[in-house]
Amino acid sequence: MTYKEFIDINRLLRQKYIVENPEEMLKDVDFNQLSLPSNTRVIYLMGSKSDVLDFSKYEQVEKILIVGARKVRKIILPQKDCVKALGISSMTNLETIENISFHKGMRYMHFDYGVKLPNFSFIRDLNQLLYLSFTANKKLPELDFIHPSSELRFLDFVDTSIFNYATTVSYLKSLKHLRFLTTGRTSQKQRDLLRSELPHVCMREG
């Protein structure tokens, strides 16, 4: 597979599962004081005036993208399996995501640019995920939070330290459906090991 084909597949997945339309963006609002239609399917926020984002009443929401909401410590999702895509970027004080384990049908998730959740154990319950990105998360823990039976096809570890763990390659090797891996910067020794242990995975550095 060529580099362009790799990028095209990545782009198609993001377009399918996450919204990035500036026309639908809510900027620096107190979201909990808003009254969106109950059948809202897409929520795109940039910034937040509240330290809690409560989406629990939107039981038809499918896509949530939150960027730069640095005040937010807690996100509350609906107690119903409805969210198919969750994107969280530049939220350095986020501590918890309530009800996320209800959303077993989730297909896309990214935690990018300094999201400092204390752990990612909830991902073990989300076995239908296809795409998972941790771009620029320097303190990412070991990968025991990803279940071997996961349907994950695409993993992104650009600008992380994940390959400093001796266990990383064995965890990746256990993911039978993994096909695309963005490693970020790695040493020649690490690249050789990855190619040897993951011969069926298409890889790029970034």
Give each language-model segment a name.
Residues 3-95, 99-118, 122-141, 145-206:
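Concave beta-strand-loop units of leucine-rich repeat
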